[in-house]
């Protein structure tokens, strides 16, 4: 099989000190010291509408007020014709040519806002430069040093319009035909000279539309687009970052100074925080006929993948009829039987956790504040059963005073805190029936699944336990996990724990039809080390107590790393077994620069690769993905 390396791009230097933009750094050169300033070329043609006039708030039922320009149906039809024409050009040694390795095109950056900056904007930009130059520490910690964080395949990429890709191995299974695999992840459009954490990049969706059964001969189509959050639009129009990020923008005195500059920008009308100041870079959810890009620091953003062209568009923030006024978890749970969606939000002010749900039509229910959480904690994920919701309270906490007094981050670990699991009836209207169970040393970032046993008297939770939680934000390469099965006896209050595997597994997925119900198999990314994923493992939970429960594993080879696997059930040719389906993910070869979409047989003892698609552009390492079926794509609300 021929392997093609994308053209390596060098880091370009700029005289401007406002921002820096990274091009792809080849692995061999990624460790070399970089210039503290990077240039970003601007297109001086037509400037798009300002951010204030180009965002959309979606409600449920659908009510739109102002903003993001949507493609018209005529534009979609033109794109269909253009994509189909392009597809005829691709041929390889097996009848198709390898895709072009030219760099993806970036949408033109507006020049008007930068060239005609107002006096208040100029003043605030100057203050940012003072902070960057004189207040930021001369040496940033590795976890927030952009020259350390954004190297190799963590370097951001440009947007990629819908581009055909050849299938270079096997054949796409019929159960995937016509659907799209979409992966979310951080991809900063600007990089400040100040600190930057991996979690803080703008969200970019990398969508691979697979050909439908009726379109024989067509190729899959890859499209990479930014989620156009209000923050993204404001900074795009400004030509530089203007809003601090949660994990890197509020460190020490410099963080407080940046907060003051943001306040000045708000008071002078440069931005409106009510439009949202957060990211949508973590995950995706398909619910009530809409596809959402999710991040904990803002409301969900409605996005759409065109079922014919593969184009990805942002349609605006969704407040669900004005009932969702703050952000929510990036890991909501959709009950596969009832169609309901369960979610929560957390924050630095009481109530530190609030639980809520949506009915199958997308109507949000009442908030249930959880006042028994007495300290602001980092609560990234949770679990549901048929009758309960389970909340983990871990040792990562919010500590604003550490930023003020110690010059540290407002988010850090508290080794003296005892982790707990909170159990509440999932249809509770208040927290009066909330029960907490101490589980020392049990720190989870992601849950696998939960269910009820013994007639509802016992709850079972499966999750990777982060054994070195103090490194989860600062030294991810030192993080190690052990997957555990935790059993909570609601009658006696006794909690028992059984280790299932100690292979540094995280980013778990299951067959989504079993969410909240007893299931047997889970699939995990294998840290090599974290945050890189060097392989995929399959665990059999029924083997609990027999030692290592790993029953299948695939390593992608030296220098090859993947993202989170996603399980797609085979509802076409399968026999209905839980593991009847396929695992899909993107894989990057750091030696050659080659990128693939990989399909693995979830039933095989070695997770056999049954199909590969060669991608025309680089897909950076990211977070969570989703497979959307052809029927779901076609039923998306406009």
UniProtKB/Swiss-Prot annotation:
InterPro entries named in the record: Carotenoid_Oase
Compartments reported by the entry: Plastid, Chloroplast
Chief location bin: plastid
Presence of the UniProt keyword Plastid in the record: yes
Annotated segments matching region Disordered: 28-80, 92-113
Cellular-component GO terms for this entry: chloroplast stroma
Low complexity: bias regions: 28-37, 44-69, 92-102
Annotated binding of Fe cation, by residue: 331, 380, 446, 624
GO molecular function, one term: metal ion binding
Top-level lineage group: Eukaryota
E.C. number: 1.13.11.51
Catalysed reaction equations from the record: a 9-cis-epoxycarotenoid + O2 = a 12'-apo-carotenal + 2-cis,4-trans-xanthoxin; 9-cis-violaxanthin + O2 = (3S,5R,6S)-5,6-epoxy-3-hydroxy-5,6-dihydro-12'-apo-beta-caroten-12'-al + 2-cis,4-trans-xanthoxin; 9'-cis-neoxanthin + O2 = (3S,5R,6R)-3,5-dihydroxy-6,7-didehydro-5,6-dihydro-12'-apo-beta-caroten-12'-al + 2-cis,4-trans-xanthoxin
The UniProt record lists the keyword Cell cycle: no
Interval spanned by the transit peptide: 1-80
Cofactors, names only: Fe(2+)
Induction pattern: Induced by glucose. Induced by drought stress. Down-regulated by submergence.
Cofactor note: Binds 1 Fe(2+) ion per subunit.
GO biological process: abscisic acid biosynthetic process; carotene catabolic process
Keywords, sorted A to Z: Abscisic acid biosynthesis, Chloroplast, Dioxygenase, Iron, Metal-binding, Oxidoreductase, Plastid, Stress response, Transit peptide
Sequence similarity: Belongs to the carotenoid oxygenase family.
Role this protein plays: Has a 11,12(11',12') 9-cis epoxycarotenoid cleavage activity. Catalyzes the first step of abscisic-acid biosynthesis from carotenoids.
PANTHER family: BETA-CAROTENE DIOXYGENASE, CAROTENOID CLEAVAGE DIOXYGENASE 4, CHLOROPLASTIC-RELATED
Protein name: 9-cis-epoxycarotenoid dioxygenase NCED1, chloroplastic
Organism: Oryza sativa subsp. japonica
